[in-house]
């Protein structure tokens, strides 16, 4: 494989401000806008009801992030019209895995309040739009947002914050109205200029020209960017995202007859969307050959790399988990340094104790204490408390970006270590609380979200089939052989429970289906979480390494304040092959097996099991690319087909069985390695002016067919920095690696850097030899593993009879 490097231009962008007018009018509560949604509140406590509404609708002002900061600061582009155009309603689920909003309609359809696409700027008509559309191109919607009449749950008077309700204004939750896809919310853009829009697109209903690229000259950097990056023309809507965008999906117990047209009774907010193409959504306005597309969009359905924006140069997409039996999740005693509620602050710095202005007794004190906490995320990295982990999700999806975290994330093309945003710096929770009203609005209501989480119960297969547990056992024994469920239980006790049970040994005496008796707060909660939640070294589980090397919670990284002090001090797995390991420690937390029948394929990256895909009518939005390769990592000549999305009970069950076959027979798994399906251009260095005024910037071209991980987990900045040190300050390079590499490895490092430098010949283009490419991967890749569906071979030595029995038993959990 040859890696080609060349010089090319990198464009800059501006945002122009427009003057706006003001309208006024009464806001409407979200529950009154959607009776179908409100029906789901009937069985909930006031606190859980409030938490559900926040989970489904609150964006916490991240619409600004996706409209401005995402493109201008991080180089990402989203073509919202490509996703959300009313005429694409039938493809929302098939192309993007999005859940269509049952309350929205296509303008012009019978019984739809909007009669033309001009009225809605090409989008669907949704509840609340009669008010919202009045503010397109005008100021004033912030006070008319449905969040402003959000019905708060009763205030908790038992905390140090006292008995007076001093919660941040609910307006700062920022709901907007639906886009037609649940979890994606729209807001009127006060900067919108209808005349500019008509001139560009020919109609208020169209966005077509807005998505076209700025230049047809392939030699120009503008050929890789479109109007989404051009601030001189702004769209009619700003689009925000709630947590529900990734977690709302179809209820395994009541799936829709037509997934393209669900009813509210088919929808659950906590099951996790295993069909979601949110990664492709976030890159929908970019060409596949640019770096940002590769970093963001390289994910199969149902997984997303949550560190792609606060980039840690580790490609580690993970599943959007179902949230079941929250109160049964194990907790562990850890050293936790965090902010806790206080009624007053002594004299001292605000960095350790701070009281909110114009509030009484509403203070926060930062201190260290031993505290029982959950292990959240795939490696247990979120480890200072469940409430804090929930709030961090809002930052991961763009909330408080300008006030709190954009200046802590790296610029992908900052090549000078002394340059601002060359690398990560830690997010400051105290500073964000002080400066971002949306932080406080969410934080003041985290208890409500937790209360909503506590309502989720497993989706049992017997309930999905409408039969009793005894009848299900009889069906499974008939399918897999007499006595299979009981034999499978014995196999589970012997081979699985050590990792996949939260109860104590001896497991022979454990009832894995038991519920907590007479629990008035969380009725029918299962006793067993079906995971011990203890992080396991990667070498033990053996699955794809990417997620275990996630490093954003380590010291000096962006989410450092969200990690327990002792948990992040775990040793690096000594058997990792990477020579200079990234900051990740190399651990995985065993996933819960609750309702495992409904959530195949398996593993943190959905890679063990058949590939699944939607079947969109618009083939330009068909993102399936076969990952199947031969032993030489070349595309398989006749790869297995992907299975179509199927949310039905039988569809989930059949996918479960096929995935279990691959899990328990690892030698039969077809090899999966994601390859670049287009040439990839990586703009590395900023523009410089050379002779005759020519502007150029360093760029790397990765050819089609290269394993995507060669790029996605490459610390190319470190490599460039080391080349400079080798040339200008070799003593400093020696000191940098003295405590990391052996003398032999340090000599090999210098020799490799010299070889790479020698191949940087004068001219606009040069090639790297295979030897240099191998050196770069060995020394500068955070993840050397390429096979995505390897590992977890624990059941391979079971007999065929035991394997089939285990599948039968797992179907009952």
PLM features per residue range, with description:
Residues 4, 9, 23-813:
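Periplasmic c-type cytochrome electron-transfer domains
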């Amino acid at each position: 494989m040859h890696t080609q490097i060349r010089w090319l231009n990198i464009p800059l962008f501006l945002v122009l401000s427009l003057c706006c007018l003001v309208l006024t009018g009464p806001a409407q509560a979200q529950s009154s806008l959607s009776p179908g949604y409100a029906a789901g509140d009937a069985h909930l406590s006031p606190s859980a009801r409030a938490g559900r509404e926040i989970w489904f609708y609150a964006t916490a002002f991240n619409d600004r992030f996706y409209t401005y900061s995402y493109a201008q600061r991080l180089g990402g582009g989203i073509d919202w019209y490509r996703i959300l155009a009313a005429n694409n309603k039938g493809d929302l689920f098939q192309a993007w895995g999005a859940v269509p909003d049952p309350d929205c309609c296509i303008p012009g359809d019978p019984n739809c309040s909007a009669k033309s696409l001009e009225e809605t700027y090409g989008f669907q008509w949704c509840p609340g739009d009669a008010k919202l559309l009045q503010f397109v191109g005008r100021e004033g919607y912030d006070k008319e947002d449905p969040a402003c009449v959000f019905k708060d749950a009763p205030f908790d008077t038992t905390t140090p914050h006292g008995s007076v309700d001093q919660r941040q204004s609910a307006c700062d939750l920022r709901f907007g109205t639906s886009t037609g896809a649940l979890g994606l919310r729209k807001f009127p853009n006060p900067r919108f200029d209808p005349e500019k829009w008509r001139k560009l697109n020919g109609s208020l209903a169209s966005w077509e020209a807005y998505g076209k690229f700025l230049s047809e000259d392939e030699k120009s950097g503008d050929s890789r960017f479109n109007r989404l990056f051009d601030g001189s023309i702004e769209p009619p809507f700003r689009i925000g995202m709630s947590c529900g965008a990734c977690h709302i999906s179809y209820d395994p117990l009541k799936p829709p007859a037509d997934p393209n047209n669900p009813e509210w009774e088919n929808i659950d907010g906590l099951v996790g969307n295993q069909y979601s193409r949110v990664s492709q959504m976030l890159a929908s306005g970019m060409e596949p050959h640019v770096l940002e597309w590769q970093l963001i969009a390289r994910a199969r359905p149902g997984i997303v790399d949550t560190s792609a924006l606060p980039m840690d140069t580790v490609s580690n997409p993970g599943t959007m988990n179902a949230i079941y039996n929250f109160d049964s999740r194990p907790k562990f005693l850890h050293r936790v340094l965090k902010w806790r509620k206080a009624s007053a602050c002594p004299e001292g710095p605000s960095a350790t104790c701070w009281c909110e202005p114009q509030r009484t007794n509403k203070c926060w004190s930062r201190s260290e204490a031993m505290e029982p906490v959950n292990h959240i995320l795939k490696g247990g990295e979120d480890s200072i408390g469940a409430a804090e982990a929930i709030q961090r999700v809002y930052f991961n999806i763009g909330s408080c970006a300008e006030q709190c975290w954009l200046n802590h994330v790296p610029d992908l093309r900052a090549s000078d270590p002394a340059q601002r945003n060359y690398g990560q710096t830690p997010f400051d929770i105290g500073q964000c609380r002080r400066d971002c009203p949306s932080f406080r609005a969410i934080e003041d209501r985290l208890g409500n979200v937790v209360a909503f989480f506590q309502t989720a119960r497993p989706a049992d297969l017997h309930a999905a089939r409408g039969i009793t547990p005894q009848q299900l056992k009889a069906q499974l024994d008939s399918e897999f052989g007499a006595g299979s469920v009981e034999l499978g239980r014995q196999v589970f006790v012997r081979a699985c429970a050590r990792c996949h049970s939260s109860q104590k040994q001896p497991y022979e005496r454990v009832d894995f289906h038991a519920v907590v008796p007479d629990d008035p707060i969380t009725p029918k909660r299962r006793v067993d979480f079906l995971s011990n939640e203890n992080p396991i070294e990667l070498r033990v589980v053996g699955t794809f390494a990417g997620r275990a090397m996630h490093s954003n919670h380590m010291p000096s990284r962006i989410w450092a304040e969200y990690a327990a002090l002792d948990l992040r001090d775990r040793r690096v797995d000594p058997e990792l092959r990477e020579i200079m390991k990234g900051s990740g420690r190399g651990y995985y937390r065993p996933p819960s097996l609750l309702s495992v029948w409904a959530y195949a394929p398996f593993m943190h990256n959905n890679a063990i099991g058949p590939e699944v895909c939607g079947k969109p009518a618009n083939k330009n939005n068909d993102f399936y690319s076969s990952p199947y390769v031969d032993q030489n990592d070349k595309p398989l000549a006749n790869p297995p087909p992907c299975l179509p999305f199927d949310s039905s009970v039988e569809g989930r069950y059949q996918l479960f069985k096929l995935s279990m076959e691959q899990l328990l027979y690892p030698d039969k798994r077809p090899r999966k390695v994601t390859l670049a399906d287009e040439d990839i251009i990586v703009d590395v260095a900023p523009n410089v002016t050379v002779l005759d005024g020519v502007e150029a910037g360093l760029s790397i071209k990765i050819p089609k067919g290269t394993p995507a991980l060669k790029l996605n987990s490459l610390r190319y900045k470190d490599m460039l920095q080391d080349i400079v040190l080798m040339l200008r300050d070799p003593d400093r390079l020696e000191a940098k690696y003295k405590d990391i590499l052996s003398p032999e490895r340090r000599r090999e490092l210098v020799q490799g850097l010299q070889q790479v430098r020698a191949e940087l010949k004068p001219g606009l283009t040069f090639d790297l030899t295979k030897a240099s490419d191998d050196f770069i991967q060995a020394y500068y890749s955070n993840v050397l593993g390429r096979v995505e569906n390897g590992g977890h071979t624990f059941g391979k030595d079971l007999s065929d009879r035991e394997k089939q029995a285990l599948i039968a038993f797992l179907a009952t959990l």
